[in-house]
Curated annotation (Swiss-Prot):
Name by which UniProt lists this protein: Phospholipase A2 homolog
Main location, first listed in the record: secreted
Keyword annotations from UniProtKB, A to Z: Disulfide bond, Myotoxin, Secreted, Signal, Toxin
Important for membrane-damaging activities in eukaryotes and bacteria: annotated span: 121-133
Record organism: Echis ocellatus
Organismal lineage: Eukaryota, Metazoa, Chordata, Craniata, Vertebrata
Tissue localization of expression: Expressed by the venom gland.
């Protein structure tokens, strides 16, 4: 089942290290990334057009912007390590890129937790064609 979840998330287009990001999201929100966030709104799971639908979707927009600031890194493939201390995610200091990718993923997981009250099931599996126009600048 876990392998199926990982493959499904990867195919849908979640960026970053799928395993680590997925664990962070589960730990912070209590929600499984698939299906909760893999195609939520206009920015969670890809797409990246139009305006974020709510604060949850905005978390994914900001996450995409964070990755955009790492042009010399490979956030889709670089795996990193982190641990939790006193309920907080601590990114390990392996390489500069891996640490910065981890910090981007940590930020989105915390943002999703802080905005759980805005999560709206009507934006799960939101049709990408409804996301029109250029996104705002990061």
């Amino acid at each position: 089942m876990r392998a199926l979840w990982i493959v499904a998330v990867w195919l849908i287009g979640v960026e970053g290290s799928v395993v680590e990001l997925g664990k962070m999201i589960i730990q912070e929100t209590g929600k499984s990334p698939f299906p909760s966030y893999t195609s939520y709104g206009c920015f969670c799971g890809g797409g990246e057009k139009g305006t974020p639908k709510d604060a949850t979707d905005r978390c994914c927009f900001v996450h995409s912007c964070c990755y955009d600031k790492l042009p010399d890194c490979s956030p889709k493939t670089d795996r990193y390590k982190y641990q939790r201390e006193n309920g907080e995610i601590i990114c390990e200091n392996s390489t500069s890129c891996k640490k910065r990718i981890c910090e981007c993923d940590k930020a989105v997981a915390v943002c999703l937790r802080e905005n759980l009250q805005t999560y709206n099931k009507k934006y799960t599996y939101y049709p990408n064609f409804l996301c029109k126009g250029e996104p705002e600048k990061c």
